[in-house]
Amino acid sequence: LILFDEAQLSDEQSVRGLYFDSIVRRALKYFSDAKFVFAHPFIENPEAQLQKNGIETIDTTATYSNYELKNVGQIFYTHDSTSQKFYHFGSDSATLGKRKLEANFDPIESALKKGGSVLIYVPKSHIYSKQVYIQFQKYISMCQPIDNPIAIKMIDELKEYIGASTTDKSFYNSDMLEKLRCGIVVHHGSMPLTARLILEHFTQQGFCKICFATSTLEQGINMPFDVVYLDRFEESKTLSVKNLIGRAGRSTNKPVFDFGSVILRPNAMSRFRKVYREKNTLSSKSRLDTTDDKIDEKYEEYKEAIKTGEFSDEYNLTNKDLEKLKSDNVTTVVPTLLDMMFSDAGFVLPNTVAKEVYEDFQCLYKQYLGRELTAAEKFVFDSAIKIRIWKMHGKTFSKICQERYAYVSNVAQRRLLSQAGQQDRADSLTVRYIAGYNDIPDKELRTYPLFPAETKGKDVDYDRIVYDTYDFLDKLIGFKLSDLFYAIFHQYYLAYQDDRAERLAKYIKYGTEDSTEIWMLRYGFSFEEIEWLKPCVESIDQTEIK
């Protein structure tokens, strides 16, 4: 049985939709006897999932159903931020009337006073700029510090994981953790997965009072709230809106009438009514089969390889790419790179890696792309390679975040000046350049720093470093570069039997060369889990764990 949850992702107008359908088709090819289940909320034509991937022709017994169920009802409000008044309005003007009626209370304040929780849906940029903390200060001030030992333990776990300090405002200070101590949660797609799981558990345990969240929460696990406030309304994303509304209210076993509250801006009222009534349908044509996508040519090659069966599941690359990565232009660079990456004692230390190493990695990536890198792509790529080298040396996520923060915010120099009694000079030091995460390849990418040049070192947001580091590790290194460089070095090892190439290939892909740890990683265990589980493992391979 293979379950594809949130299967509406196949319709996303981004490479995510492309990758989703490619996984479906590869699974159909290799697991033809398996039962495939697709689950998507609010979709009127679930049969489109069968049509776009040819499942109806493969299996004529395939069935589908559309369940129109609602777990709990909602009351709708609009909030006039100028007058600070709330108004009731009907989701269906034909049935409930077109007029809004003033509410004589604040539903957010009321929920918080009763010990309830509030989800506020905002743009990620407003979280990064801290605008949300000013905009919703009235409600934040109602949230007092939490003294529950279970909650404090979870906060301390998160603090240790990201490597933050909460005692020194000048170094490694996490504003996110300070807010969390008062039950204020921040949840978005650049939050490390481990951190997200802690925060979701924190919320489920009832410790969350206010949650500022982006669209990542749409497909999150069960995290209901008493009030959902849509500070951001995206009319084009009807499924997103309906998913978020669905988080308002929870059904309980208590003898009370269960319902949730949904709040919008006045200018979103009519658009919301339209979205609320709109039927959601999937396209019956896969993005793999469209020909007018405006995407990088590498993705066009990927689409063609999936459709023609010219895709290697061993390396997660097209056969065309694999041939390219065995060319003389690649194999002449690899031994030079291995010489620089290894010393007699093993891997060279990260701080002794020569700039030629970055140039050689760039050269290999250039051969893969079949073109020169733009200046902006080079900055992003070099940052990714530096982080990858740190990982190869066993640096934890927290240590990598601390290293990047120390560099960009001039920690060493600021501390020296501060200890010398020159606090004003320490406070006036500005940041050093560091490239922020961006998806590459992207020929249109512009060069920009993670922090503007005039930013003071003492004002560098440690949380922003955490989010950016995770984006590099998850979206670029883990999702793209690891497969590419694993293929380069593993193929070189097979051709020339250079053990260093095999070691480097394993470290690039898995972060270890230990075969037991590699198998455990492939089974889905994290390094944190492997640390205590490994002694319990007698044997492990592709068939079983003993």
For each of these PLM feature ranges, what is it?
Residues 1, 102-210, 225, 233-241, ...:
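Conserved C-terminal RecA-like helicase domain
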Residues 1-32:
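SF2 helicase catalytic motif II
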Residues 2, 210-233, 260-263:
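A short beta-strand element within the Helicase C-terminal
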Residues 3, 34-41, 210-213:
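Structural recognition of the conserved hydrophobic beta-strand(s) that form the central parallel beta-sheet
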Residues 33, 238-281:
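Conserved segment of the helicase C-terminal RecA-like domain
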Residues 37-144:
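Conserved interdomain linker/interface between the two RecA-like ATPase lobes of SF2 helicase motors
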Residues 235, 303-546:
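C-terminal accessory/interaction regions of large nucleic acid-associated machines
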Residues 267-326:
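Long, hydrophobic alpha-helical segments
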